[in-house]
A protein has these predicted regions:
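Enzymes that bind and transform nitrogen-containing heteroaromatic metabolites
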Residues: 1-191
């Protein structure tokens, strides 16, 4: 069972900042070719997902008892999803097999809970960037896919802060796409 941080977070080249949106919005899965290959690798073999409260909802979502996420009645996960939050809430069962569970846990504790629910499949760390950084810093990620987008934002959450030397533990490969993005994969060495 592997831990995958298969993100679709846009990372800018100037600072490694993220804006939380897909670089290929309007083109789900990209326009074909290499983007499509990476998009097709996103879901197979995933048995559970971990995400941060910021990915689950807008600031203050925890104050709205009717908020069920931004994905509508049939979210795209189709697995148990563990939302890391300090705001306890009962689990929410959605169409298509997605159940949101709200937990206040360390990365190690959250991963243990997600692995139990994953039924011997991989666990995906879905984001946001702070959650991904926490799992990377704890040495819990086996594989990560990040998309570098050729835009300058000048704002956003910095993904790489505090992760100096990360490349020593991973085989890093970059694949450029005709769409202008670069897919960067990190595969843990020695696993």
């Amino acid at each position: 069972v592997k831990v995958r941080a298969t993100t679709h977070i846009s990372v800018t080249p100037e600072t490694g900042c993220t804006n939380g949106c897909s670089p290929l919005s309007g083109q789900p899965g990209g326009s074909g070719g290499v983007d499509d290959v990476f998009a097709r690798q996103h879901d197979p073999g995933i048995g559970a997902e971990i995400m941060g409260a910021g990915k689950f909802g807008h600031p203050g979502w925890h104050e709205d008892p009717n908020w069920q996420g931004a994905w509508g009645p049939n979210p795209p996960f189709h697995t148990p999803v563990f939302v890391l939050t300090h705001h306890h809430r009962p689990s929410i069962e959605m169409e298509g097999g997605t159940t949101f569970h709200f937990i206040d846990a360390s990365p190690t504790e959250a991963l243990e809970t997600a692995r139990e629910a994953a039924d011997d499949q991989d666990v995906r760390i879905g984001g946001g960037p702070t959650i991904i950084r926490d799992f990377l810093a704890a040495g819990l990620v086996d594989y990560m896919h990040t998309v570098v987008v050729p835009i300058l934002l000048g704002r956003g959450v910095r993904l790489w802060d505090g992760l100096e030397g990360l490349e020593q533990d991973y085989k890093v490969e970059a694949t450029s796409s005709p769409t202008g993005v670069t897919h960067v994969t990190f595969t843990r060495t020695g696993t």
